[in-house]
Amino acid sequence: MWQSFAEYISSLCEKNPTKICEIGVGKFTQVFDYLNKQDNVEIIKTDISPNDSSVIKDDVTKPDLKLYKNLDIIYSIRPPSELQPHIIDLALKANTKLIIKPLFNEDINSKNVKLTLKNYNKASFYTLGV
């Protein structure tokens, strides 16, 4: 499933470089690692509690908008339901594509914003602006 999710994001990388941010990276880095190996990708990762120096500290409920300027894609893997509206708001403010992979069988907390459910190979997730 994670390979399919990473491949889908990679398929959206039309620009060289495509600028991507993973929000709320936590300890799971499989998708980040895959994307980081792509020649046409510049990627950063943010989290409120960074695990190491490669993660930029940022609170998505009060984001530093400068971090997200000129991004092409924001994605988040299993963000808590209460953070999902903040991630959506951030993507709208940054005028970027958004991909959210919620927990299995979890409904997305999008408030009044319509996201599209996407099935790609073995992965299911929600998109905005894609």
Feature map (PLM): residue ranges:
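A short acidic, Gly/Pro-enriched loop at the edge of an enzyme's catalytic core
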Residues: 65-73
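Conserved S-adenosyl-L-methionine
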Residues: 36-42, 93-95
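Conserved class I S-adenosyl-L-methionine
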Residues: 16-27
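Adenosine-cofactor binding site in Rossmann-like domains, unifying the SAM/SAH pocket
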Residues: 45-66
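Conserved SAM-binding loop of SAM-dependent methyltransferases across substrates and taxa
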Residues: 27-38
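C-terminal substrate-binding/active-site "lid" region of AdoMet-derived donor-dependent transferases
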Residues: 81-130
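S-adenosyl-L-methionine
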Residues: 1-16
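Residues in the short beta-alpha loop(s) of Rossmann-like NAD(P)-binding domains
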Residues: 26, 47-49, 104
